[in-house]
């Protein structure tokens, strides 16, 4: 076969590409070294006579990378984020198709480029597993823009002609079979079909996850669902921005209905009612600050839920959502089945609202949400209308390239297949060894500070905190099960993709995703396993398993620097991220879970009160940061958990780094990087800042403040380092400088 004979050509291409890369690195390194030597000769940079310098290619590369990011005209004690990041931000403007851009999105894009290359390789029946062949076919169908344009809206209209998907606003404009009937409308049937077949959660979010108070067991959970707009407050506020977003959403709903065949005046009338309904739903949603672990844990059986909220057939809904052909052992779900109802008051209010609302409006809203979720899978005329909407709410001015959209889709639809493809080529197993060094260093640092510097926690609580810290399990790179081809092939055996039917392929993946979590119901939680996509550029803490997780996608420069680079760079970047995730086990939410992952009080009352008192300092510190780009102050209470993790992680990683210097180098500092005059401690803090370099459009800035779990990047950097005396020592920041909070510094861990 032709595809089988291409391997030698591909190898040749790789060899040529490798030669070009080596040449570029050599030439680039020579230029950097030459520049450094010139600057030294001119007295503009100095090489300290008593210091050892590293002139290896890796060190020259690192020095060049740092020089390209910094702005030496800014005083690091006045604004360290600008000092560290201005150069990078200036050289990396926000792409027109993105609402924000930074080092995280930059690395995400580089991972996507690698996945694109892997997915575009011709299918080899000999080399590629069945699952990988399916991933390539799915990608090919997504890239088949000619077929997508030819299909236009036909696949969606086919769905809209059948119950329960008939859209009232379309009336008889798509044929008599598409006419909605109030008499035949069933809220339960519609909600169950959306969730069970299309993975669309509207009004109600039903899913399976570990029981917070019995973390070895899985349980059904019920929660409020999302809205059309990302920010709940945009339905409630009367600010100019919020009004413009609601207006843009309304026009988008109207135009989408018209594109699908609705009469414009009918669409305008009906969508006003739809928007009013969604505003009512936004009003009753439980805000983030009230969604505490304790408040969200309301365990009861379905019979008790039905007695509390009798307006809805909860048992009937759950049984219709779960496909018992896939899971025959779940046929016996009965009124005695336990569920965790995370938002009881929301559900009471929801069915009060729905009980007084016209069925036609409810149906229009439900189908709108299904249509909205499928717009990315339609032809260009729908994409361009979405872009007009995106201009208002995100500030983007162009669509993502089709390949980028397709890679993102395949990655979300078949994460473990794509993850294996990535890991096989781009993940080096020796990274696990260095990550173990970093994890154990952070673990030691946390316990060391707990024993030597924590004066507010009593001995009993401190003992349990150390037990939990010792029990934290680190997962690195990828879950082992993705390497089991037989297992992954079997998991996808029911899926049959066609290169000519992208929309149909999407529907298959939605059904697969819709049913996947029910696999775990009635099964024990595998505490040593993890289920994170290996290509994810992020890291995580899981309270229910007491795990910290670092996927392969995250373990790349400038986050993870190999052993051939100064350790200061890795400890400052991925090391702080390790500390950040580790500290999540002891933040305002994670601290409530014990070493086994159970929501079980293990703090003394006295220690808990002192913890809460100390958090007030951090809440006030971050709440006082005003972001001009967003026109808003940071929400210190909303971002508290992440701010605790940032501050604790920074301290832990720095202490771990200094221990590494003492243990591995007998206290001798690492060789310095040439020409940039930064000490190793300064490089540590620069590396911390560099992975958080980011810039935002005003729309994205506003959204980040409104719903982001993290503080904006500049305040993440400046907030944590201004609380840390070791930073002030490293950069000689005087007591009255902005980056030295002195006696006002906040600290928990």
Swiss-Prot record:
Q: Which keywords label this protein? A: Biomineralization, Cell membrane, Disease variant, Disulfide bond, Glycoprotein, Hydrolase, Membrane, Metal-binding, Metalloprotease, Protease, Signal-anchor, Transmembrane, Transmembrane helix, Zinc
Which positions does UniProt annotate for Zn(2+) binding? 580, 584, 642
Top-level taxon: Eukaryota
The annotation note on the cofactor reads: Binds 1 zinc ion per subunit.
Residues modified by carbohydrate are 71, 238, 263, 290, 301, 377, 484, 736
Q: What does the tissue specificity note say?
A: Specifically expressed in ovary. Expressed at low levels in kidney.
Disulfide topology:
54-59, 77-733, 85-693, 142-406, 617-746
Q: Where is the active site?
A: 581, 646
What ranges does the Cytoplasmic topological domain annotation cover? 1-20
Q: What does this protein do?
A: Peptidase that cleaves SIBLING (small integrin-binding ligand, N-linked glycoprotein)-derived ASARM peptides, thus regulating their biological activity. Cleaves ASARM peptides between Ser and Glu or Asp residues. Regulates osteogenic cell differentiation and bone mineralization through the cleavage of the MEPE-derived ASARM peptide. Promotes dentin mineralization and renal phosphate reabsorption by cleaving DMP1- and MEPE-derived ASARM peptides. Inhibits the cleavage of MEPE by CTSB/cathepsin B thus preventing MEPE degradation.
Q: Subunit notes for this chain?
A: Interacts with MEPE; the interaction is zinc-dependent (via ASARM motif).
Please report the name of this protein according to its UniProt entry. Phosphate-regulating neutral endopeptidase PHEX
What organism is recorded for this protein?
Homo sapiens (Human)
């Amino acid at each position: 076969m032709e595809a089988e004979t291409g391997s030698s050509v591909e190898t040749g291409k790789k060899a040529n590409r490798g030669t070009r890369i080596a040449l570029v690195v050599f030439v680039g390194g020579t230029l950097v070294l030459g520049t450094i030597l010139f600057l030294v000769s001119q007295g503009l940079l100095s090489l300290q006579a008593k210091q050892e310098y590293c002139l290896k290619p890796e060190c020259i590369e690192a020095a060049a990378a740092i020089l390209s990011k910094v702005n030496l005209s800014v005083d690091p004690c006045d604004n360290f984020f600008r000092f560290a990041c201005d150069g990078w931000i200036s050289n990396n403007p926000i792409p027109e198709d993105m609402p924000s851009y930074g080092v995280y999105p930059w690395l995400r894009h580089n991972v996507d480029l690698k996945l694109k290359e892997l997915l575009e390789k011709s299918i080899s029946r000999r080399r590629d597993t069945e699952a990988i062949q399916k991933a390539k076919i799915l990608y090919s169908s997504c890239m088949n823009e000619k077929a997508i344009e030819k299909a236009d809206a036909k696949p969606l209209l086919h769905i809209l002609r059948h119950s329960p998907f008939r859209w009232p606003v379309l009336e008889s404009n798509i044929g008599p079979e598409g006419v909605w009937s109030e008499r035949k409308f069933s809220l339960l049937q519609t909600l169950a079909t959306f969730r069970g077949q299309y993975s669309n959660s509207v009004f109600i979010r039903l899913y399976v996850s570990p029981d917070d108070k019995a973390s070895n067991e899985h349980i059904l959970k019920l929660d409020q669902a999302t809205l059309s707009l990302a920010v709940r407050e945009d339905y409630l506020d009367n600010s100019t921005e919020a009004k413009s977003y609601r207006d843009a959403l309304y026009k988008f709903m109207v135009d989408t209905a018209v594109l699908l065949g609705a009469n414009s005046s009918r669409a305008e009338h009906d969508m006003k009612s739809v928007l009013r309904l969604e505003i009512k739903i936004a009003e009753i949603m439980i805000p983030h600050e009230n969604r505490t672990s304790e408040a969200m844990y309301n365990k009861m059986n379905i019979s008790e839920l039905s007695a509390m909220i009798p307006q809805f057939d909860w048992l009937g809904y759950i049984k219709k959502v779960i496909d018992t052909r896939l899971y025959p052992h779940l046929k016996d779900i009965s009124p005695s089945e336990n569920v965790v109802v995370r938002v009881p008051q929301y559900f009471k209010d929801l069915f009060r609202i729905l009980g007084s609302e016209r069925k036609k409006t409810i149906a229009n809203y439900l189908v709108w949400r299904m249509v909205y979720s499928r717009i990315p899978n339609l032809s260009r005329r729908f994409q361009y209308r979405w872009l007009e909407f995106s201009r208002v709410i995100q500030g983007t001015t162009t669509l993502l390239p089709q390949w980028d959209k397709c890679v993102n889709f395949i990655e979300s639809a078949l994460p473990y297949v794509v993850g294996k493809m990535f890991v096989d080529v781009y993940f080096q197993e020796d990274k696990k060894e260095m990550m173990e060094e970093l994890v154990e260093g952070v673990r030691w640092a946390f316990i060391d500070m707990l024993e030597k510097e924590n004066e507010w926690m009593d001995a009993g609580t401190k003992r349990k905190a150390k037990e939990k810290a010792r029990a934290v399990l680190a997962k690195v790179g990828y879950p082992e099960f993705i390497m089991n081809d037989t297992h992954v092939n079997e998991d996808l055996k029911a899926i049959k993709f066609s290169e000519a039917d992208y929309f149909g392929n999407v529907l298959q993946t939605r059904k697969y995703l819709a049913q996947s979590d029910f696999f775990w119901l009635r099964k024990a939680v595998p505490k040593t396993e993890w289920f994170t996509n290996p290509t994810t550029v992020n890291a995580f803490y899981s309270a229910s398993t007491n795990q910290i997780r670092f996927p392969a996608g995250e373990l790349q420069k400038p986050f993870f620097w190999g052993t051939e680079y100064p350790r200061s760079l890795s400890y400052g970047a991925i090391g702080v991220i390790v500390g950040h995730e580790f500290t999540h086990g002891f933040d305002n939410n994670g601290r409530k879970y014990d070493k086994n992952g159970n929501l079980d009080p293990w703090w003394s009352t006295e220690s808990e009160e002192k913890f809460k008192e100390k958090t007030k300092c951090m809440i006030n510190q971050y709440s006082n940061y005003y972001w001009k780009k967003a026109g808003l102050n940071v929400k210190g209470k909303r971002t508290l958990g992440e701010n605790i993790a940032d501050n604790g992680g920074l301290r832990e990683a720095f202490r771990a780094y200094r221990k590494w210097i003492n243990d591995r180098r007998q206290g001798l500092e690492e060789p310095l990087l040439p020409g940039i005059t930064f000490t190793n401690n300064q490089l540590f803090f620069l590396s911390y800042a560099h992975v958080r370099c980011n810039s935002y459009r005003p729309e994205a800035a506003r959204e980040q403040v409104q719903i982001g779990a993290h503080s904006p990047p500049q305040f993440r950097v400046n907030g944590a380092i201004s609380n840390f005396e070791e930073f002030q020592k490293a950069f000689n920041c005087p007591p009255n400088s902005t980056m030295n909070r002195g006696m006002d510094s906040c600290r928990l861990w």
